[in-house]
């Protein structure tokens, strides 16, 4: 059966390449620091960006966390290498999945280059079935984003309308401010933070021939009080059956096991894989409501595919039956009831790291509820948030205004940037579309004329 193994241990970090003059200035306060950065530094917890690791080992001053970054500029101007030693199951089908690389990284496994990541907003995945050994070594060579930006193609027509940092698919506030007289970037760092490194989980995904590769699960609440569970899926191999289980005995609401059910289907199998598209009628499902209007009833959906009676792959998601209507701009009715939005705009919780911080996020949700907020805007110039953030919004009834990661005016009209943005949008929609808390999609922040 398909399973995922996160690589949390066995990681270390070192600086690579030549050091620019400004970088050495940043290290001048301690001669031993420069020497230590040429050696491997053990990473205690993953994911962790370079700034997280150096601070934890006492290689960055305390003032860095307060926003004074002069002594940390060398991080964004340097190349960095992550190394991970891990044990694998040789002979099994396996992919390696990176769910957060910041940003330009060449990836090597056992001396073989797997490829390069150049987009902060996209996961990277490689099939390593033929390379995986019992004992393995993974290297991630992160290229300086400052140097990479300066090397990108630039067209004269962009002068005056496009910021140069937009040739890199990374948050624009991670780069030096173009108007240096301001003294800091938008998020308050002086002069700026440039996070680099691994900000999301790295996992081995062991899989079978029969596999789920894409899914679209939608719960609709009809006007008559009944519900429809819509399922579209596709995958590889030749599974015999696909079985859908659903119940409402989750964390929120009262026990409603009598509303659950199960149904099996035979997928449409072709030479290039399989697919299925079905609708299941659900009698009077408990409805999902935004905070302050009712319970956040969630249905747990477990879908399995089998071959010769063996479960080969499955997905587990929580969904909510609700109906959203917008009769005029921003006049929303949910499940037939008028809902007034009380919102806040969510900025990244930290400037110096893009790693998700569950404790800080829980505190944020407490503040949101204390402020009587029922809607959060995910800022287009911010960073992607993991599934657990949206799961928490589902549980708490917090509606989401989701922006695509674009903002602050025009972008280069190059084929490379267009292709990245298209892939980002497709990935984000596929990942989030089943969440009942998702209220609307927005094209970005402050870029109607040039986005």
Pin down the residues of each PLM region:
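Substrate-binding cleft of carbohydrate-active enzyme catalytic domains
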Residues: 323-451
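Secreted/periplasmic carbohydrate-active enzymes, especially glycoside hydrolases
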Residues: 1-376, 395
């Amino acid at each position: 059966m398909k399973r995922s193994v996160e690589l949390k241990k066995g990681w270390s970090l070192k600086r690579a390449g030549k050091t620019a003059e400004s970088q050495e200035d940043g290290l001048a306060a301690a001669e031993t620091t420069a020497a230590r950065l040429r050696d491997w530094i053990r990473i205690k917890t993953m994911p962790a960006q370079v700034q997280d690791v150096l601070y934890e080992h006492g290689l960055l001053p305390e003032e860095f966390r307060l926003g004074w970054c002069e002594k940390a500029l060398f991080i964004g101007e340097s190349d960095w290498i992550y190394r991970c030693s891990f044990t694998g199951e040789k002979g099994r089908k396996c992919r390696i999945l990176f769910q957060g690389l910041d940003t330009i990284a060449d990836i090597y496994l056992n001396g073989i280059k797997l490829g390069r990541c150049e987009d902060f907003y996209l996961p990277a995945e490689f099939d390593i079935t033929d390379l995986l050994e019992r004992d393995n070594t993974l290297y991630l060579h992160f290229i300086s984003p400052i140097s990479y930006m300066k090397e990108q193609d630039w067209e004269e027509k962009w002068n005056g309308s496009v910021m140069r940092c937009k040739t890199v698919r990374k948050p624009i506030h991670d780069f030096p401010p173009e108007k240096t007289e301001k003294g800091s970037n938008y998020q308050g760092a002086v002069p700026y933070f440039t996070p680099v490194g691994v900000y999301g989980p790295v996992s081995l995904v062991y899989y079978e021939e029969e596999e789920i590769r894409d899914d679209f699960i939608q719960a609709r609440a009809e006007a008559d009080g009944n519900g429809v569970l819509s399922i579209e899926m596709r995958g590889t191999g030749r599974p015999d059956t696909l079985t859908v289980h659903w119940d409402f005995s989750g964390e929120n609401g009262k026990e409603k096991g009598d509303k659950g059910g199960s149904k099996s289907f035979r997928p449409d199998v072709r030479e290039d894989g399989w697919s299925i598209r079905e609708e299941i009628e659900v009698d009077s499902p408990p409805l999902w409501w935004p905070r302050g209007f009712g319970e956040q009833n969630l249905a747990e959906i477990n879908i399995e595919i089998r071959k010769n009676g063996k479960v080969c792959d499955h997905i587990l998601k929580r969904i909510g039956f609700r109906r959203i209507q917008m009769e005029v701009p921003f006049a929303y009715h949910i499940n037939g009831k008028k809902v007034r939005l009380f919102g806040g705009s969510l900025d990244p919780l930290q400037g110096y790291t893009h790693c998700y911080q569950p404790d800080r996020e829980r505190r944020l949700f407490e503040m949101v509820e204390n402020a009587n907020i029922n809607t959060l805007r995910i800022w287009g110039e911010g960073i992607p948030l993991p599934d657990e953030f949206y799961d928490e919004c589902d549980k708490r009834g917090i509606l989401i205004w989701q922006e695509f990661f674009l903002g602050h005016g025009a972008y280069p009209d190059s084929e490379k940037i267009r292709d990245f943005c298209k892939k980002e949008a497709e990935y984000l929609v596929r990942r989030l579309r089943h969440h009942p808390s998702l209220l609307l999609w927005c094209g970005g922040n402050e870029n109607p004329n040039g986005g």
